[in-house]
Amino acid sequence: MTAVTPDDLTISPRRIEFELPDPLPRYWHGGDPFKTHFFNAMSLLFPDGERFFIDSVRYFRDRVKDPRQQQLIKGFIGQEGHHSREHIEYNRRLEAQGYDVTALTEPVRRRIRYANAHFSPERRLAA
């Protein structure tokens, strides 16, 4: 496989931490219910989606011989792993507000399980 990664690309894991007020206001995004629920929904999707992407990349990691590509893979996995942990914590806060997080995330998990069972590693990586 030929790499087409730009020479100047680097992925440095950023340790972004959400600075959430405690308690988290119901409509935390400027008091706007729409914006709040939009970002809540995104946060609910991210941990499982990020894990899917990490697993898809990790499957091929040992086949990559280029040290630079290996560093990019390591950076990607580190970045997504940290990002996912932040969303998991945020989602716990939503659960504390009374949201049924499992009911909202289970359909995504079912689709990911289906993709893992029915799609080749190459196809999952292409996602």
How would you name each of these model-derived features?
Residues 2-127:
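Non-heme di-metal
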